[in-house]
Amino acid sequence: MLVLGVVSVNILNGKAEIFTQPEMVLVKAGSFQMGDESGELWEGTRPVHQVILNYNFWIGKYEVTFAEYDIFCEESGKPPANDQGWGREERPVVNVTWRDAIAYCNWLSEKENFQPAYNEAGELLDFNGNVTTDITRVDGYRLPTEAEWEYAASGGHEAVPIPPRFLFSGSDDIDEVAWYFENSGDEMIFTGTPLTVDYSSHGAAKIQGKSTQPVGQKKPNELGIYDMSGNVWEWCHDWYGEYTVGEKVNPIGADFGHLRVMRGGSWIFGANDCRVGNRLYRPPHEKIFRLGFRFARTEME
């Protein structure tokens, strides 16, 4: 059985509370070429540019599961996320908005007595609770920046070979590391009309045969991180913006926008969509059956 963390006991308001600390992987500071010039990927992955991350950070070893998210929902009074009829437990949570994801991160921070990373407006907070754009000063759990996500998916400080990096997170053979359209189940059957499918509310009654899979079943990447290609797309912190030329240091995305970045591809997408250099976006209020998240945290000195 998959174990996602270690159990500790916290004393809150005089009451003993059992809490499962999440399993995370340390990613050490470094630089990499962000983006992908391949003609097989869309223009939004270009131009390739140098990114420097001059700090260490932690990132979730696994995508957040229903088992973990359900505890948050029970304690916070939020309605549970829809599992599409596929089952819960160790499957990655889906049908969560960007704001649901950052609320989970703040809840997790409070569990471990860290300064929450977000205010109600979704702005980053430093370790004193002040709004900041300096990711190195954010104490609590948060969504990974898009740069952190791609660096970690590419193998981070353990990346081999350098260059070139693997096409997918941990391998050039997608079947080794990812659940995607070709291996996520039997032939897909639409029971609704495909041309009128509303993917924002797409349910198990309208699609059968393929689905998400329990986390951690495929080969991990060089850092020991699972499912960064395929299974579910993952929310990132960043507002979506077009890439520009020139070196970037500790980027956190566009200054403002109306679309948040998502990364990694999913069980219902093709191989190219699961490439580490690929990127897409969705409005932060959307709940989608192919989109979940994992969390990150800056290593404090």
Language-model regions, residue ranges each:
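Short Gly/Pro-enriched turn/cap motifs at secondary-structure boundaries
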Residues: V48-H49, A205, P214-Q217, P283-K287
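A short glycine-rich, aromatic-capped structural motif
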Residues: I18-P80, V94-S109, S229-G230, F295
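Surface-exposed aromatic
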Residues: G85-V94
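Short, structured beta-strand segments at or near domain termini in extracellular proteins/domains
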Residues: I288-E301
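Short, flexible turn/loop "capping" segments at secondary-structure junctions
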Residues: H49-I52, Q84-G85, K206-Q208
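Boundary at the C-terminal end of the N-terminal hydrophobic targeting segment
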Residues: G14-A16
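Bacterial N-terminal signal peptides
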Residues: M1-S8
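Functional-site microenvironments in short loops/helix caps that host divalent-cation chemistry
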Residues: V27, Q33, E37-S38, G87, ...
